[in-house]
Each structure stands twice: as C-alpha cells, then as structure tokens.
C-alpha cells in the first residue's frame, strides 16, 4: 500500500491534506467577479504549512473551473527573471482581457528580481488590471520586502498567518490512515503541536514502522 503521507516540500498531500480556515479565507475572496483583496502574504515559521496553503490555492484556481471562472495561475521561480517567466506563460496561455491572472511565489525575500516584479505589479494594480498575487515567506523576509520604498501596496496587503492544524482532524486522519486506535492517534497529534510538516513526517515514519515497533521506538530514532 502506498504511503498516504508525504514530506516532499511544496507538494499538497493527496490523501492526508487537512483543510484550514486560512486556505478558505483566500479562496472565498477569489469567488467574486471583483475580489476585495488583490494580494495575500502567507507567513509563519518553518514547517507551519505556508507552502501547502499556497499550493492548495493555486490548485483550486486551476482546476475548480465551475467555482473560479477565467483564472490563469502562474507559479514562478523567485530566483529567476520573474517578469520574463510571467510574459512567457501569458503567451503560452493565450490569455484574454477578462482573465484574472494570479501569480504565486513561494518563499519571497528582498531580492533584485522580487523588488523589480513588485514594483511592476504595483503599476498593474494602479492601472486596474485583474491581477492578483499570493506569496509565502518567513516573517522577517516579508517585513524586509514590505519596507522597500514605493511598495506601499505590499506593506498594506492582507497578511495570512499560519495556525496549528486542528487536533481533532489530525487525530481522525492518523486513526483512519494508519489503522490505529484513538488514544495513539491523539498522542501522535499532540506530538506534532499542529505543525503541518511534523504531522506529515510522523505519519510517514509510523506508516513505515516495523512489526512490534512502538511509537516510543520511532520517536527515539528521530
């Protein structure tokens, strides 16, 4: 049987994804013809699920066409020419003037490419183009970029802070996917402290545990 848990960075778990209110907060805004928020900054400590939220938002906008109409999603590499990447993707997509265009960037920081993109994006917003931007980053990196001169829009943009995963949902997921009792599943959920990465990593290890190996044995080897 395939391991339902994954520790692959930036990959949305197919079988063990736990929905969060933060994800829905962003997606709910994008349902409307003219979303009230154009920019979201997803921030939190390492391992708290920032990238998973971004990946889920991008996935929903791309695939749920009945709910999100005329959306184009560009997932770009912040270490390369961001504007060049977006231009190439626009040409390939054959976009129309009514298409809403969302750029997703994981782990932003104050780099030359990011400042250049953000400055241009601010011009697009002022011109009234249907452009949207969702990014993730550590708090200090988000703050450093926010303090760049003339990036007022980014400084004032909606900030989404990651929160611990729901204890009950984690317990239920562990119980069903690992075929264990409620007490052990609850203990595992507590150990993760709600961190998305810890939830997946502990799930991976317990799925692969040997016969007779206990949770205590697994934790001693971490």
Describe the predicted segments one by one.
Residues 36-56:
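Walker A/P-loop nucleotide-binding motif
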Residues 157-185, 191:
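Conserved small helical "lid"/interfacial subdomain of P-loop NTPases
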């Amino acid at each position: 049987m395939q391991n339902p848990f994954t520790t692959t960075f930036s990959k949305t778990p197919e079988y063990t994804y736990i929905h969060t209110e933060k994800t829905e907060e962003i997606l709910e805004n994008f349902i409307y013809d003219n979303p009230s928020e154009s920019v979201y900054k997803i921030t939190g400590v390492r391992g708290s699920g920032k990238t998973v939220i971004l990946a889920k938002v991008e996935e929903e906008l791309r695939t749920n066409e009945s709910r999100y109409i005329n959306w184009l999603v560009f997932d770009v590499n912040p270490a390369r020419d961001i504007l060049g990447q977006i231009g190439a993707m626009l040409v390939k997509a054959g976009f129309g003037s009514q298409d809403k265009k969302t750029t997703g960037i994981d782990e932003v920081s104050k780099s030359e490419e990011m400042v250049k993109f953000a400055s241009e994006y601010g011009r697009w917003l002022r011109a009234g183009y249907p452009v949207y931007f969702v990014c993730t980053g550590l708090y200090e990196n988000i703050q450093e970029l926010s303090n760049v001169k003339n990036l007022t829009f980014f400084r004032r943009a909606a900030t989404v802070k990651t929160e611990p995963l729901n204890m009950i949902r984690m317990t239920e997921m562990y119980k069903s996917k690992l075929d264990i009792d409620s007490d052990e599943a609850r203990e595992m959920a507590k150990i993760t402290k709600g961190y998305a990465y810890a939830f997946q990593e502990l799930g991976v290890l317990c799925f692969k545990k040997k016969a007779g190996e206990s949770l205590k044995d697994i934790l001693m080897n971490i």
